[in-house]
Amino acid sequence: MEQIDKQKIADAVKVILEAVGENPDREGLIDTPMRVARMYEEVFAGLKKDPSVHFDTIFEEQHEELVLVKDIRFSSMCEHHLVPFFGVAHVAYLPQNGRVAGLSKLARVVDDVSRRPQLQERITTTVAEIMMEKLKPLGVMVIMEAEHMCMTIRGVNKPGTKTITSAVRGAFKNDDKLRSEVLALIKHN
């Protein structure tokens, strides 16, 4: 993917500041357009990445029971309003034939999928689909909890509300006991 055009972003931010009645050349705002451009380059860094590459290296271990990495902090930008949403992801899978991923790789996939204009529902589904395709586990369960600034600072103005999404694949879809185990472990401190 091409590099992000920071100058184009900075020019657009300057136009926005003028459109809302601000003077983009005043002290305090003079460097804001380029600061915003650099911020977008960082928060949209996932656009330039293929998150599935984190699972190119798989380890062979004699472990075929639940693996859960919980409370993976993430942030993203709502594609509808370009304001942040942030929260935690809980990612579980049931290895098959001893195929396990490095634990940090689960967090890296969540980060790469999140760092682009996004919807929480899509992040949840995409993480689950990548894991099913690359790890070939018996099942995957991804649960994400997030606060959306588009609900907090505008519109309904409901600070503190959380949106929870889930993607359930394979063995987790048909096994209530397995699903319940994941949910209990997520709640457990």
UniProtKB/Swiss-Prot annotation:
Pathway annotation from the record: Cofactor biosynthesis; 7,8-dihydroneopterin triphosphate biosynthesis; 7,8-dihydroneopterin triphosphate from GTP: step 1/1
Enzyme Commission number: 3.5.4.16
InterPro entries named in the record: GTP-CH-I_C/QueF, GTP-CH-I_N, GTP_CycHdrlase_I, GTP_CycHdrlase_I_CS, GTP_CycHdrlase_I_dom
An annotated GO BP: one-carbon metabolic process
Leader sequence residues: none
Reaction catalysis annotation: GTP + H2O = 7,8-dihydroneopterin 3'-triphosphate + formate + H(+)
Name of a matching Pfam family: GTP_cyclohydroI
UniProt xrefs under PROSITE patterns: GTP_CYCLOHYDROL_1_1 (PS00859), GTP_CYCLOHYDROL_1_2 (PS00860)
Source organism superkingdom: Bacteria
Keyword Nucleotide-binding attributed: yes
One cellular-component annotation, GO: cytoplasm
Binding residue positions for Zn(2+): C78, H81, C150
Family to which this protein belongs: Belongs to the GTP cyclohydrolase I family.
Protein name as catalogued: GTP cyclohydrolase 1
Native species: Listeria monocytogenes serovar 1/2a (strain ATCC BAA-679 / EGD-e)
Gene (name only): folE
